[in-house]
From Swiss-Prot:
This is Zinc finger SWIM domain-containing protein 8. Residues 1021-1042, 1146-1161, 1435-1446 have a biased composition (Polar residues). One of its GO terms (biological process) is protein ubiquitination. Residues 55-65, 1121-1132, 1455-1465 have a biased composition (Gly residues). GO terms for molecular function: ubiquitin-like ligase-substrate adaptor activity; zinc ion binding. Residues 1176-1211 have a biased composition (Low complexity). It comes from Mus musculus. Substrate recognition component of a SCF-like E3 ubiquitin-protein ligase complex that promotes target-directed microRNA degradation (TDMD), a process that mediates degradation of microRNAs (miRNAs). The SCF-like E3 ubiquitin-protein ligase complex acts by catalyzing ubiquitination and subsequent degradation of AGO proteins (AGO1, AGO2, AGO3 and/or AGO4), thereby exposing miRNAs for degradation. Specifically recognizes and binds AGO proteins when they are engaged with a TDMD target. Component of the SCF-like E3 ubiquitin-protein ligase complex which contains CUL3, RBX1, ELOB, ELOC and ZSWIM8. Interacts with DAB1. The keyword Cell membrane does not apply. Its main location: cytoplasm.
Length: 1832
């Protein structure tokens, strides 16, 4: 992880190459744009370069000249010349020791050239924007292009001839001037824009590496001094004649001035300039900074940054084809990006150059920073962004954590704010330079104030709120650091500036008299105005350079050889052009205004107060990583005198309270208690470098020093008095109250207002001041001093840890929620300090142990959630930085034992007692130390790994500790702290990824990792996966009340928002007396009538009959029943589902606990569609399998017992916590900890893709694929691939959980990803899906996947695909016909048993409506095919299919066999008696299947008493396994009531126990009820039951009312009265005689060979499904479809085939078919064909009897009605072309009407109507002709 601290190690200083490049956009855009010549100052340091700067004490070595050759000792003269050359201006040497020998002059000049090529690289890169010129220069140097180098004194020149050019044309003359190991100017004739061109670089490199090859000469003035007068004249004349054109005019002008009688300057000043003699003593030795080019390049960079730019994405897939990230993830990335990736890259590289210059003590640091700052502030967009981000909601807790970041502009704004904060941080370090003079510090203070005002002024021109100005930290942290005096705070002899002896550069200028025009700082480097870049690089010395005297002796001539210091010309000349600095610095004088009226405090206006207490925190810059050197972020709320007023002591009590004062009371005492100082806020002030104290003389004078003192004293008592959020903004409440008035009276202008609350650094606590000193020393290269100080600070930090406890919130109430802003500040401050201490301490081996302790202390810091989003992200980032630093420190035995101890605590769970913020970074570090492989992914092992300190159990301990950390639950909810939850997830993801990669080959470990990561133990909302992949069974801890994806058990009695009491008014379908358990999740108001509360299995009969308004059945997708997936969910509220997906409802493995007394209503289908399975299996936060700690204290629910009692069977319960109608109040973020959320779903998807990439797979979801990075590797690692698949599936479950409309989606990139992975993985993935697709995928998605998988070559995969297809058939109503038919084909390809299961599943789904009739006819044909297969010879009676316990067929169709919805088992024909099971006493307890949904119940028009369902539902008591009634489905369309067959009981002894007669065929007698007996009532003993409504068989729809009969066990033979039109006497029939009176088998079946009972079952099933198809035809009958009256609609053949089937089964079946056909067939032609064919199949001799049979009569009537409708319909749309067809239809109609006695009369009426119609006479003539000629 790259470091971002201010004090980073040399090899790690951040430049662009290190930074995190998000989406690679910076790289792409910078490289692809042609005009970006400036390459962002990349390459300014050699990547491998160490700290070999020459500026260290003795100027480090880089040149060959410094080495001792062959062991020779360097002479003392050389050593002294070298030191003098580095430190002392040559003019001073001459002044002090007048006759300097020429040889010594040459040696000093020799050593004055810089020795380190890194400096050349740095300045070349600065000037050119990249290291390219340096590289080219290096090439020229190596190619020996530098010719004739000559050094004259301090002037170096040469000719550079690039090899490919002809010498005269391509030769460039280069000149370089230098002084004290710094190049002070350079020039070249090549005309390049930047002064540091390739040729200058080549010459400098030549001089550094081949110093001995350069010809050395003394300065020109030295040589001239040796000439005689005539020699001098000769020299001048020869010079003029050599270059007459260039020199002659200048020579004449100089002669004129010298000979003038006037007192010209040249005559009045002694001495003359010499460019080769080095600068004057008063000049600063400064590297030549090419300011104009640099400024232009900075402008270009900033312009490009501010302007709109195309967004370049490196991965099309991830950006465009995946869903957009949710707000929490987007905001996290937006806030983290400026901390990690540095943008704009160029400016950040310049800032890092400034930092490096500080370290080298290069005086260009401040000028460069000034150029940068000036340029940044000229762009209003930059200042606007900086201001808005630092005063924005994400930096205050008032945002409600709901802000959504909007893409690129938001990212740019945060990056910009981060960049500006870093600038302020660097200014703060600049003013804390220990060698800085007070005068210079005052100048900088004035400049910083000007800049702050400029920002505010820019902002005012924009649209920003003026009221937030004082919340904007801006330059305040740097301004506060100006009020500081090293001499008082931390004097270091020889380092800190002192008034008595000026140390820096040996201050030789003091030897000269002070010059009037000299710069004020008395020679201090930064204060000297810099020459403008426009000056000639090799310029004639201004007046004041070396001059040789004319005519005096040598000894006397040396003195006047330079201008005396009194000559002010030079100062004037240098000050003039560079006045830019001076004028700004002088602008505010000494900043006196700023302190006037420091008492003016203002209460924030109401709009500000809405920002809540922590706006103060806004000032924290997320990116200010200068560990404490960051902006002190706040200076302006409380008022304390900005300067240290003369009347205030150097360290007054701290009054600056960025947060409510009470929060700071412990600071000085707790943090670094030292000395008797009063409590101070320093610890919380992140930006303040500890400790600086101002003295009077280095502070700007103040206008009201008294008021400052008064304030300070007055404020101190207020600290800690009351917890009022508003105290954040003023020192105490009393001051705040009068703030407005004070402001009005005492404001002396805007600047005063802005800086009124400034808190001088010196007023911080002693330890804060010392931290500031340590940072400054480290930043400015004083590493020894910094190291000593940091040891003290580290020990103090460990001895006095900060107090981060949060007081419990007061009484309930939103406004009183506890503020954690103080703790947050303390935490971020502490981490900042810890990282700084780590950085400094780790540089020296003797401090490694202390550094390790500081790092562990920081990682173990327990903190509350941060008060703002920005701080939340920053804290997480800081932790990761500390962990990265800690990993680099070598560890000894004591450190390892500490780590083991922490790992043990993590494993045992004792480490975190209260943790909203989990110690995941600590766990990650422990895992890295104990378990990470010897060679890490980067190929290097941190020095941390010392094999001698390792112990055998370390790896296992590390693994268990890490896994335990993955399972930790946070105690905060996503709604309150979205970014904390996001950060926790990301840290868990990183840790889990490391674990999975490390243990990818160990399946047992992978299972443990996934169990914790996907939170399997808590059984809350988790997908049921890995059951087949990892064989071990999952613990069924259903009673763990963890509301979570990772929830910790909540306290008993805590009312969770998603639970509600069922004690309220019973909703329709609610069970009023079902016990005190929570009614699964909705508050009552959240249960609209539209939610299908139909009681389902498991409810007592009373519940099943609870009144419920008719017609409230919502549309198919809105229904639903179980969290997991209720098979019923799609079409009908009460359809049962297949066993293997199911709840314990009809699951034979859940015996006693799923009894009627279950208080948890665990099987009520409360909500739509199929809520995610993951939650459906008893895993909801309010899961019914909750224990007694549930929200309403329900007794230990049977759900828990069920879960544990069911052994291998999975406990699956309904999740009802979320309403799929989109009514969940917390649609985005849950208010309960550890709940699923949109952000969690997105995170887990990304994690799944990452795991897949690590496995070697390709995570692409589209055609834009990129080649896999794993070269010859064959496919992804299988175990990791499966892990990725499971994580993705879990994510999809979470996503569905929070997406109300997921069932209706048509495309999802997530789903396509999952199906793609399933195809790659093969059968293992499909097996997982068979178990748990229900909450994750929709049936069409599953069917599509199964279809794709069925084409694989692997037989296992094909088999798994068939299983998958079978698993989605119970939801056939959600599939289209092609999908269903393909699934049936897949099952058929496997074996007959699977085909049977498939057919039954489709049939069961169809009973609720929604399945196409064509599909059902296809199913019927499949049943018939099975019949033919089994009847065709191999009639093996499958015993498994006929026994209840073995349950081959039974188990397969358990959903159908469980008598759901009051019907008989699927094999039950409506005219047969439903299966009767024998109780121990052989009592007959039949199930009355009076109302099979084959005959749809009446709709709204029917006259039920409300709430009584038209069907009969009796509770069966079968001994083999408990079965439950379900509330039957309402038909999709209300229809007229249909006749129903009556049902007769059969003695149980007649059949094997629990088996339906339909299975048994002709071997057993079975009873049917012919229509003539329809009015007979049935009587038999019934156990005590609820009232039952019976609809007897009747012919006239709508006439009878159902009768409710209370059955009681007291009456052994209660009767069911049956009504047919009029009341008939009830016949009481005993069961036993009925058996003998049963009808014989149908005649078709009585051939010589006995029929296989199993094949007969298939035949019955084919008929049954065909009839269901007819019913479906009727349901869609009212559509105005062209096929309605077609002569041969598509279903004709199927209907006729069904008639043949009915005839095969017997007369009664034919009658039943007639009833169905009358309902389902609309075409009069088809109806007529059916009538005629039926008459043929029945005995034609008794045709009239048949016609009188009710069913047949109804069919004929329907046919006649259809003809009437047809004729009416055709008359409307009739054209002459249709006449023939119409006439034929009339003829057919006549034959139909002839079938009934009154038919012809009706037909004649039709003809009369036809005659009266408006049609033409021609039509009537043709019709009448046809009628007369047609004889029926």
């Amino acid at each position: 992880m790259e470091l971002m601290f201010a004090e980073w190690e040399d090899g790690e200083r951040f430049s662009f190459e290190d930074s995190d490049r998000f989406e690679e956009d910076s790289l792409c855009s910078f490289i692809s744009e042609a005009e970006s010549l400036c390459q962002n100052w990349r390459g300014w340091r050699k990547q491998s370069a160490g700290p070999n700067s020459p500026t260290g004490g003795g100027g480090g070595g880089g040149s060959g000249g410094t080495r001792t050759r062959d062991g020779l000792v360097i002479p003392l003269v050389e050593l002294s010349a070298k030191q003098v050359a580095f430190h002392i201006p040559f003019e001073v040497v001459e002044k002090v020791y007048p006759p300097v020998p020429e040889q010594l002059q040459l040696r000093i000049a020799f050593w004055s050239f810089p020795e380190n090529e890194e400096d050349i690289r740095l300045y070349s890169c600065l000037a050119n924007g990249s290291a390219d010129e340096f590289q080219r220069g290096d090439q020229l140097f190596r190619m020996r292009a530098v010719k004739d180098p000559l050094q004259i004194g301090f002037h170096l020149s040469a000719t550079v001839v690039p090899p490919q050019m002809v010498p005269p044309k391509g030769a460039y003359n280069v000149a370089v001037m230098f002084d004290r190991c710094r190049v002070t100017s350079c020039s070249c004739t090549c005309g390049a824009g930047a002064k540091w061109c390739t040729h200058v670089v080549a010459l400098c490199l030549f001089r550094i590496h081949n110093a001995s090859a350069v010809c050395l000469r003394a300065p020109v003035s030295e040589s001239l001094s040796r000439l005689q007068r005539d020699q001098l004249q000769k020299f001048a004349q020869y010079l003029i004649s050599e270059l007459p054109q260039q020199i002659l005019p200048t020579a004449q002008r100089l002669l004129d001035e010298l000979l003038s009688s006037q007192s010209t300057a040249i005559n009045t000043v002694c001495g003359a300039p010499d460019p080769t003699a080095g600068p004057s003593a008063s000049d600063q030795s400064t590297w030549y900074l090419d300011e104009s080019t640099l400024t232009d390049n900075i402008k270009k960079t900033l312009h490009k940054f501010c302007g709109p730019s195309p967004v370049v994405f490196s991965d099309v897939n991830s950006m465009y084809l995946s869903s957009t990230e949710p707000p929490a993830a987007a905001e996290w990335a937006c806030l983290l990006r400026p901390l990690r990736g540095r943008e704009p890259e160029g400016v950040w590289n310049l800032l890092s150059i400034v930092r490096e210059m500080f370290k080298r003590r290069d005086s260009n640091a401040a000028p460069l920073l000034e150029i940068l700052t000036d340029q940044c502030l000229t762009y209003e967009q930059i200042t606007g962004w900086w201001y808005s981000v630092r005063t924005s909601a994400s930096h205050s807790s008032a945002s409600g954590h709901t802000g959504r970041s909007n893409g690129q502009s938001e990212v740019a704004a945060h990056a910009c704010a981060s960049m500006c904060d870093e600038m302020v941080t660097l200014w703060r370090l600049a003013v804390l330079d220990p060698a800085l003079s007070p005068q210079r510090r005052r100048e900088l203070c004035a400049q910083l104030r000007q800049w702050q005002l400029k920002v505010i002024e820019n902002v005012k021109r924009g649209q920003h709120k003026k009221t937030l100005e004082r919340l904007f930290p801006g330059f305040r942290p740097a301004v506060e650091a100006c009020y500081f005096n090293w001499e008082e705070a931390y004097p270091l002899p020889g380092v800190t500036y002192s008034g008595t002896d000026r140390k820096l550069a040996l201050c030789w200028a003091r030897a000269l008299p002070a010059r009037p025009g000299a710069s004020r700082s008395g020679g201090l480097e930064e204060s000297r105005p810099r020459p403008l870049p426009t000056e000639p690089a090799v310029r004639p010395k201004e007046p004041g350079a070396k001059r040789k005297g004319l005519g005096e002796g040598i000894s006397s001539q040396r003195g006047p050889r330079r201008l005396s210091a009194e000559g002010g010309d030079k100062a004037l000349h240098k000050m003039g052009p560079s006045g830019g600095k001076a004028k700004v610095l002088g602008g505010t004088g000494s900043g006196g205004k700023s302190s006037a009226g420091s008492g003016s405090k203002r209460r924030l206006s109401s709009e500000d107060s809405s920002l809540e207490p922590d706006l103060a925190e806004m000032s924290l810059d997320d990116s200010s990583l200068a560990l404490g050197a960051e902006a002190s972020t706040f200076g302006g709320f409380p008022e304390s005198p900005p300067p240290c007023p003369s009347s205030v002591g150097s360290r007054g009590p701290s009054t600056f309270l960025p947060e409510p004062p009470d929060t700071y009371e412990e600071d000085a005492g707790v943090y670094f208690s030292e000395g008797p100082e009063p409590p101070t806020a320093s610890a919380d002030h992140p930006g303040l470098l500890p400790g600086e104290v101002c003295t009077r003389d280095d502070l700007p004078s103040t206008d009201d020093s008294g008021s400052g003192l008064h304030k300070t004293k007055e404020a101190a008592p207020a600290v800690g008095e009351e917890d009022d959020d508003y105290q954040a903004y003023y020192l105490n409440a009393q001051d705040g109250a009068g703030g407005e008035e004070e402001k009005a009276e005492g404001g002396t202008g805007e600047e005063h207002d802005l800086f009124a609350g400034l808190k001088p650094l010196e007023q911080e606590s002693r330890m804060e001041v010392l931290f500031a000193c340590a940072e400054a020393l480290h930043a400015h290269g004083y590493s020894n001093e910094a190291s000593r100080l940091t040891v003290e600070l580290a020990q103090d930090l460990l001895a006095n840890p900060p107090d981060l406890k949060v007081e419990p919130p007061p009484a309930k109430g939103k406004k009183n929620k506890v503020s954690t802003s103080r703790q947050t500040w303390v935490a971020t401050n502490t981490l900042t300090k810890a990282a700084f201490l780590l950085t400094v301490l780790s540089e020296r081996p003797e401090h490694h142990s202390l550094a390790f302790r500081v790092g562990m202390f920081a990682l173990e810091l327990q903190r509350p959630p941060a008060s703002t989003k920005a701080l939340e992200v920053k804290l997480a980032y800081q932790e990761s930085e500390v962990a990265a630093l800690l990993k680099k420190i070598p560890r000894g035995p004591s450190e390892m034992s500490t780590i083991r101890c922490r790992a043990e605590e993590l494993r045992e769970g004792t480490l975190c007692d209260y943790r909203p913020v989990l110690p995941l970074m600590l766990a990650s570090f422990i895992f890295d130390v104990l378990c990470a492989p010897v060679v890490s992914l980067t190929g290097s092992r941190p020095p941390s790994r010392n094999w001698t300190n390792e112990m055998p159990g370390d790896e296992e301990l590390g693994f268990e500790a890490a896994v335990a950390a993955l399972g930790m639950k946070t105690t905060v909810s996503e709604a309150e702290h979205p970014l904390l939850c996001e950060g926790t997830r990301r840290e868990k993801g990183d840790l889990a990824l490391a674990l999975m990669i490390t243990y990818k080959d160990d399946q047992a470990k992978l299972k443990k990792i996934l169990d914790k990561l996907l939170d399997r133990e808590s059984q809350t909302h988790k997908p049921q996966t890995l059951s087949s992949f990892y064989s071990s069974s999952r613990p069924a801890t259903a009673n763990q009340r963890s509301p979570s994806k990772h929830g910790a058990p909540s306290a008993p009695g805590a009312l969770q928002p998603l639970t509600s009491s069922s004690a309220g008014p019973a909703q329709p379908g609610n069970v009023a007396g079902a016990g005190p358990g929570p009614t699964e999740g909705f508050t009552e108001k959240n249960v609209p009538e539209s939610s299908p509360h139909s009681p389902c299995e498991g409810l007592p009969p009373e519940a099943a009959l609870t009144p419920r308004p008719e017609g409230k059945v919502p549309s198919r997708l809105a229904l639903g029943s179980r969290g997991g997936y209720n098979g019923r969910g799609w079409g009908s509220p009460g359809r049962p589902k297949k066993k293997h997906t199911g709840m314990a409802s009809i699951d034979s493995s859940a015996p006693e606990t799923t009894s009627d007394s279950s208080p948890t209503l665990s099987r009520r289908p409360l909500r739509g569609g199929w809520a995610p399975t993951s939650w459906g299996r008893g895993q909801d936060s309010d899961s019914i399998s909750s224990s007694s700690s549930d929200s309403l204290g329900s007794s230990s629910s049977s759900g828990s017992r069920r879960a544990s009692a069911s052994g291998g069977a999975r406990a699956k319960t309904v999740d009802v916590g979320r309403c799929y109608k989109g009514r969940r109040p917390e649609s985005h973020a849950p208010h309960v900890p550890n709940q699923p959320s949109e952000a969690a779903a997105h995170f887990y998807f990304e994690l799944a893709k990452t795991v897949l990439i690590k496995a070697g797979g390709n995570s692409s979801t589209s055609i834009f694929t990129h080649p896999s990075s794993s070269g010859g590797h064959q496919g992804p690692h299988r175990n990791l691939h499966l892990c990725a698949f499971e994580i993705g599936l879990y994510a999809l479950g979470l996503h569905n959980f929070v997406s109300p409309n997921w069932l209706s989606r048509t495309y999802s990139s997530h789903v396509s990803w999952i199906t793609g992975q399933a195809m790659e993985i093969g059968s293992a993935a499909l097996t997982i899906l068979v178990e748990c697709w229900d909450g994750h995928l929709t049936p069409p998605e599953v069917a599509s996947l199964a279809d794709r998988a069925s084409r694989a070559r692997d037989s296992n995969m094909v088999r798994a695909a068939a299983e998958l297809a079978l698993s989605c058939l119970p939801h056939a109503h959600a599939l289209n016909p092609n999908e269903i038919q393909r699934a049936l084909v897949q099952c058929k390809e496997q074996d007959n048993l699977m085909l049977e299961k498939a057919c039954m599943a489709v049939e069961e789904a169809a009973k609720g409506g929604g399945v196409y009739p064509e599909v059902l006819f296809e199913v019927a044909h499949q049943w018939f095919w099975l019949y033919e297969e089994t009847a065709g010879g191999s009639s093996t009676a499958r015993e498994g299919a006929t026994s209840c316990s073995g349950s081959g067929m039974r188990a397969a169709g358990e959903a159908g066999r469980g008598l759901p919805e009051g019907r008989g088992a699927p094999g039950t024909e409506p005219v047969t008696v439903a299966a009767a099971a024998v109780t121990a006493a052989a009592t007959v307890v039949p199930v009355i299947s009076v109302g099979s949904s084959l005959y749809p119940g009446p709709g709204l028009g029917h006259g039920h008493s409300p709430g009584l369902h038209p069907y009969t539902a009796l509770q069966p008591h079968l001994p083999c396994s408990p079965q439950y009634l379900t509330h039957p489905a309402h038909p999709a369309h209300p229809m007229p009531h249909m006749p129903r067959p009556a049902v007769f009981p059969v003695p149980s002894s007649a059949y094997p126990q629990g088996v339906h007669p339909a299975f048994l065929g002709a071997q057993y007698p079975y009873s049917v009820t012919p229509p003539s007996l329809a009015a007979t009532a049935v009587s038999f003993p019934v156990p005590s039951m609820a009232p039952i409504t019976v609809h007897p068989y009747h012919t006239e729809p709508g006439l009878p009312l159902p009768t409710s009969v209370a059955l009681s066990s007291v009456h052994p033979a209660s009767t069911f009265p049956a009504i047919q039109g009029a009341s008939l006497p009830a016949l009481t029939t005993q069961p036993s005689p009925l058996v003998s009176g049963g009808f014989p088998p149908p005649e078709e079946e009585t051939h010589s060979q006995p029929v296989n009972p199993h094949s007969l079952h298939h035949l019955h099933a084919a008929y049954r499904v065909g009839m269901l198809a007819l019913e479906m035809l009727g349901r869609r009958a009212h559509n105005d479809h062209p096929n309605n009256f077609s002569r041969s609609p598509p279903y004709t053949d199927d209907v006729k085939w069904l008639l043949g089937l009915a005839a095969k089964l017997g007369v009664n079946y034919v009658h039943q078919f007639c009833v169905g056909a009358a309902k389902g067939v609309l075409s009069p032609f088809v109806l007529q064909e059916i009538v005629m064919e039926t008459l043929q199949r029945l005995n034609p001799i008794h045709a009239h009897n048949h016609l009188r049979a009710p069913a047949f009569h109804q069919l004929v009537q329907r046919c006649q009605q259809a003809y009437m409708q047809y004729i009416h319909h055709r008359l409307i749309h009739l054209t002459p072309a249709d006449y023939d067809d119409f006439v034929n239809a009339i003829r057919s109609a006549r034959s139909a009407f002839c079938l009934t006695p009154m038919g012809m009369m009706q037909f004649n009426d039709i003809l009369q109507n036809l005659k009266r119609s408006k049609q033409t006479k021609e039509l009537w003539q043709r019709v009448s002709l046809e009628i007369t000629t047609f004889s029926p």
